[in-house]
Amino acid sequence: MSGESVIEFTGFIKACRLFRENRLAEAEAVCTNLLRKNPLDQATWALKMQCLSDSTYVDELENEDMGLAETFLDQNVIAPNARPGTSFARPKTSAKGVNPILRPTTNAGRPLSGVVRPQSSFKSGSMDQAVRTARTAKTARAVSSTSARNMRLGTASMAAGADGEFVNLARLNIDKYAADPQVNRQLFEYVFYYLNDIRVAHQIAGTASKAAGFEDYYWKNQLAKCYLRLGMLQDATKQLQSSLEQKKLIETFALLSKAYNRVDQPMAALKTYSAGLEVFPENVTMLTGMARVQEALGEYDESVKLYKRVLDAESNNIEAIACVATTYYYGGKPELAMRYYRRILQMGVSSPELFLNIGLCCMAAQQFDFALSSILRAQSTMTDDVAADVWYNIGQILVDIGDLVSAARSFRIALSHDPDHSESLVNLGILKHREGKIDEARSLYSSATSKNPYMFEGNYNLGLVSFTQGKYHECRELIEKALAAFPEHEHCKKILNHLKPLYESI
Amino acid sequence: MAKPVNVNQSKWTVPVLLKECEIYCPSTCVAFGPILSDNDSKLIIAHGGHRGVNMKLKVFQQLEQLSESSLADMPTALVHFINDLSSIPSIAVAAGPSLLIYKNLKPFYKFTVPSSAINPTESEAWKAVVNKKINGDTLLTVLKRLEDDVAFSKLTPISQTYLRADKETQVVLVEHYGTKIANSATITCIAKLTKSTAEPLDILVIGTEHCEIFLIDSQAFTILETIKIGSVPVNICAYGTYDVDYRLFVQTRASLIFCMKRGEADYQPIVISQSMITSMVLVNKMIVYTTVENLIHFASFRGKKMNTVKCPSKIKMLEPFIYPLKQLAAVIAVFDKEIRMYNEHYLLDTVQYEKPLAWVKYGCYGREDSTLVVAFKDGSIAIQIFRRKANFDTKLDYNQVPQAHALKLQIPKKTKVFIDLTQREVQLGNRIHKVYQKNLFDVKYRLAASYLELTSSASATVSTTTVLPVEISVDIHGFGPTFRMTIHLLSSSKQNLYDMHLSIISDPELYDFDTPLIPVHLLASGQSYSFTTLLYCKDPEKAANCDVRALLVHAKRATPIVTAVIKMPFSEFPLD
C-alpha cells in the first residue's frame, strides 16, 4: 500500500473546500493566515468576507422586526382611513364571525395564530399605549426604535475586531471596490449582514448597480433590501419592480410583497404573490406569504386553504402544520389538531409550547392520560418566556377539573412570571368574584384592562361588576370597549340597552 | 277620515265611506251577491239595530243604500244563495229557529228548524199551567228541578227564558207562548254548499244550538241530511260539491273543529284546541283558525298544524282573501286598528286605519272582483279595492325571531379520529384513569412546590398573604438612557398599612437610580399610590439589559411583601 497518498490541500484551495463544507470558522482562520502573508490577495479577502457574512446571515424575507418608532411614527401608510378589509389596521369588520371567545386574541387584539412571528404582533392602537404597557415586563416585543436583532448584529463586528477590524470602512475606497464585479458582492454582503452598516451597503450597491449599467437585477434587489431596512419603502418598491422586469425571482416577488405589507397595502401584496405564483406554480414562499396576509386580514378560511396548499407542496412545513392545527383546535376538532401537532413532534421539534398544545388538545379530546403528562413535560422543559402561558393553561385545566383553589394558585404563579399576563388576571378575578370578594375581583379586572385594553373579557367583566355596583357611566364606557373587540356580543348589547333608558331619563 | 297611514305603498285603494249609513251587526250578517235582475253584486247587510228595535235588511249599491226592509226577529246570520237557475238568487236570514228567505227583496218563505222532542215533564207542566192547574211558582220549581236533572240547555227555549225572567215577564210568557211550546233550536250559523258544478244550486248548511247540523235543499226546503255532533256548532265552512264530494268544517263552542265528509257517519274532532278558537276560515286547502292567545294557526284538512303566527294583539276575526287573476290567496286578520294579510309562510301586507274596526268582508261588489268592505266600530262602512298592479312580492317573515336564535349551532362532525379515540377510551378506560390520577397528583405536587417557592420569596406582584393584600405595578417611560420609573401600589387590606419601603434593585454595573429606596409611610385601603424615580442606563453602547426589581418591604418581615420584576428595554444612544 504505497502509492495511496492522502491529498493534503493547502492555502486558498483548502479555505475554499472548508467553505464549501460549511466549516466557516476554519475557513476563516485559513484565510486570515493567508492574508497575513499577502494582505492584497483579493480572492482570499473576498472569501473571508463571505465566511464572515455567511456566519451572520439572516433571511431578509423573514426579518420583520420593527421597532416602536417604525410601528407608530409611520408616514408610509397610504390611506389612513382604508376601506374595511383592505388594511391590516381594519381587519375586524371583514373577520367573518371570528368570535373572540371561541378564538382568543393576542395582546394586540388579534386572534391567535398558529405560530409566533414578528408580523403577528402588529400593534393596533396608540403609541401611548405601547409605551406604557409594553415595557412594564417581559415581552418579546422590541420597544425602542432599535430592535433586538439589529442590535446583536451591530455588536458582532465589535467582538470580532480583536486584532483590529477586518475591513475598515472609513478607510476603504468604496467606489473602487464596489465597481469591481469580482469582489463587490462579497463586500456588500459583508457590510450588509456582518457589519450591519446599511448606509455603506447602500452606497456599495448603488455604485455596483451603476457600474453594471443598471442592468443587473441582483444589485436592484440589494438596493431594495437597503431601502427596506432604511424605511424608504417607495424606493424599494421601484427597485424591485424594475428588477422584476429583468428577471422574475421568488425573492423579488417576496420582497415586493413585503414592501407592500409595510405600507399597509395587503391587496397589492396579495396580487404580487399571485403574480409570483403564476411564474412559480405552488411555490411555498408565495403561498405562505399569501396565507399570512389573509390571516392578518382575518380571512381564516382563505388562510387555512392556502396553508393546506403549502402542505400539499411541502408536507413538512411547520408553520403550515401549526396554523392548520390551531384552526382545527379552535374549530372544535381537537382530535385532528392533536394529529397535526404530533406530526410536528415527529419531525423533531420539541418545545414546551408544542407539548402544551398537545396537552390541551388531548384534554379537549378527552385523552386524559396523555393530557396531563404532556403538560407536565411542558412545565418541566419550559423557558422563562413561556412560563406564564404554561402556568395559565395549567390553571385553565384545573378549572376544568374543578379544583378552583389550585387553579387560583396557578394563575398567581403565572402572574409572578409575567405580571402583564392579562388572561391570568381576568381568570383570577373571576375566581375571586365567585368567592364573593368583589373588590379584589374588581382590582384584578381593572389591572387586566389597563395592561391589555383590547381584551374583551377584562372589559366585559369589569363592566359587569360596575353594572351590579350601579356605576353605570363606567360600565357604559367599558362595555363599549368590549363591543369594539367583539361587536356581536349579545350580552353587551343587552346591558347597553338597559343603560340607555337610564341615560334618557336624566 | 279613515285613511290608511301609508297610502303610497298600499296594495289597496284609499277607502271610500258609504253615504249616510250606520250599521251595527256581526260579521256573519254580511254577504255579497246579485239579488235583482240587473245582476250587479250588491252588499247585503242584516242590521241588528238596538235591542230588537229597528232591525232591518239593508242592501247597498255603489255608495248608497238601495233598499231596506224590516226584519221580524234578531238576525244571527245571513247567506246569499241560488235556489233557482231560471230566476234571481235569494237571501236567507237566520233569526231565532227560522230561516227567512227573501227573493227580489220580498219575503218569500220561512223555514223553521224541526222541533226536537220536549221533555215530558216539562210539557206536562206547561200544559198544566196554561190550564191553570198549577200556578207560575209551581212551574218555576218544576223547571228548576228539571234544570238540575237534565241540564239547562236541554230545556226548551221558552222554559230557559222563563227561568231567567222576572215575575211580570213570566206571566206574559205563560199568556203568550204557553199554548204552543216547541223545542226548535236557535240557528247559530249558516253556510252554503254547491250542489254540483254542472248544476250550480246551493245547499244550505245550518247549525243549531241542539248540536245538530242540517243540510237543506234550497229548492224545496227539505232536509237532506241531519248530523248530530257532540258540541254546539258556531261556524261552518264548506268545501267541495254536495253531489260529488264535500267536506264541512265545523267549529264548535268547545273549541273543537270537526270535519264531515260525504258518506261518513262517525265524526271525530280533527283539531282539539287548548285555548278558545275565535274564528275559522278556509284558504287554499288549509284551515286557518285563531285562538284567544293571539295565535293564527294554519292547519291541513286533516288537522295537522302547518304553521303558527304569533300576533301582537287580539285578533278580531279572519276573512279569506282570494285573487284568482294572479292566483293570490291569503287570510286577512283583523286587529283593533289594522288588518294584516298572511299566507302560510309570510306576512304579506299590513293596512292601518285611524278608527277601531268591527269587521271586514272581502268579495265581489258591483263589478269589482276584489273589494274589501271595512266596517268600523262607530257604524261607518268604507270600501277599498285591491289594486290591479299590487302583488305580494315583498314578504316578511312572521314570527320574527332575533337572529342569534335563528342561527343553528355549528356542531362539528364526528371525525374518524374521534371515533377511534372513543374506542380507545372504552377499551383502556381503567388504565387511562390510573395514569390520569397519577399525573393529576404530579401536577398538583408541582403546583404546590412552585406556590411554596412563590410565597416564601414573595416575588409576586399580587401579594399572596391574606394579611397584606397589596398589588404592585410598574411603568417605565422614556427611550433611554434616562428612564422614568413609576411604581403604583394598591392595597386592599382592611386596615391602613404603615412604615414600608420600596426598594429598587438591579445590576449596579448597568443602571443608576435616583432614589433606590423610597419610603412608603402610609398605604390607605383602596387608594392607589404612585412613586417615581429616574434611572439611567450607564452604558447604552453595550446594548445590554437586565431585570430591575422593585420590592415593597417592611422592617419586621423577612421577605418582601410584593415584588415587581421589570425587563428593561434596550436603551437608545444619548442625543448629543
Curated annotation (Swiss-Prot), chain A:
Spans annotated as Disordered: 83-112
A UniProt-annotated Pfam family: TPR_16
Primary subcellular site in the record, as a coarse category: other
Role description: Component of the BBSome complex. The BBSome complex is thought to function as a coat complex required for sorting of specific membrane proteins to the primary cilia. The BBSome complex is required for ciliogenesis but is dispensable for centriolar satellite function. Required for proper BBSome complex assembly and its ciliary localization. Required for cilia biogenesis and both the assembly and movement of intraflagellar transport proteins along the ciliary axoneme.
InterPro entries tied to this protein: BBS8 (IPR028796), TPR-like_helical_dom_sf (IPR011990), TPR_rpt (IPR019734)
SUPFAM superfamilies, sorted: TPR-like (SSF48452)
Quaternary data: Part of BBSome complex, that contains at least bbs-1, bbs-2, bbs-4, bbs-5, osm-12, bbs-8/ttc-8 and bbs-9.
TPR repeats: 217-250, 251-283, 284-317, 319-351, 353-385, 388-421, 423-455, 456-489
GO CC entries: BBSome; ciliary basal body; ciliary base; cilium; cytoplasm; dendrite terminus; neuron projection; non-motile cilium
Keyword Transport carried by entry: yes
Keywords: Cell projection, Cilium, Cilium biogenesis/degradation, Cytoplasm, Cytoskeleton, Protein transport, Repeat, TPR repeat, Transport
Phenotype when the gene is knocked out: Mutants have normal body morphology, but with reduced body length and width, delayed larval development and decreased roaming movements. May exhibit defective chemotaxis tendencies. Defective sensory cilia structure and function. This is characterized by increased accumulation and mislocalization of intraflagellar transport proteins and impaired movement of intraflagellar transport proteins such as rab-28 along the ciliary axoneme. Disrupted assembly of the BBSome complex at the base of the cilia.
GO BP terms, alphabetized: chemotaxis; cilium assembly; intraciliary transport; non-motile cilium assembly; olfactory learning; positive regulation of intraciliary anterograde transport; positive regulation of intraciliary retrograde transport; positive regulation of protein localization to ciliary membrane
This protein's name: Tetratricopeptide repeat protein 8
Tissue: Expressed in head and tail neurons. Expressed in ciliated male tail-neurons. Expressed in thermosensory and CO(2) sensory AFD neurons.
Location(s) in or outside the cell: Cell projection, Cilium; Cytoplasm, Cytoskeleton, Cilium basal body; Cytoplasm, Cytoskeleton, Cilium axoneme
PANTHER family in the cross-refs: TETRATRICOPEPTIDE REPEAT PROTEIN 8
Organism: Caenorhabditis elegans
Swiss-Prot record, chain B:
Pfam family, one: GAE_BBS1
Top-level lineage group: Eukaryota
Tissue: Expressed in ciliated cells including amphid and both inner and outer labial neurons of the head and in both phasmid neurons PHA and PHB in the tail at larval stages L1 and L2.
Gene disruption phenotype: Mutants have normal body morphology, but with reduced body length and width, delayed larval development and decreased roaming movements. Defective cilia structure and function.
GO molecular function: patched binding; smoothened binding
GO cellular component, one term: centrosome
Subcellular location(s) per record: Cell projection, Cilium; Cytoplasm, Cytoskeleton, Cilium basal body; Cytoplasm, Cytoskeleton, Cilium axoneme
Record bears the keyword Nucleotide-binding: no
GO BP, one annotated term: intraciliary retrograde transport
Main location: other
PANTHER family hit by this protein: BARDET-BIEDL SYNDROME 1 PROTEIN (PTHR20870:SF0)
Function according to Swiss-Prot or TrEMBL: Component of the BBSome complex. The BBSome complex is thought to function as a coat complex required for sorting of specific membrane proteins to the primary cilia. The BBSome complex is required for ciliogenesis but is dispensable for centriolar satellite function. Required for proper BBSome complex assembly and its ciliary localization. Required for cilia biogenesis and both the assembly and movement of intraflagellar transport proteins along the ciliary axoneme.
Subunit structure, interactors included: Part of BBSome complex, that contains at least bbs-1, bbs-2, bbs-4, bbs-5, osm-12, bbs-8/ttc-8 and bbs-9. Interacts with bbs-7 and bbs-9.
Protein name from the UniProt record: BBSome complex member BBS1
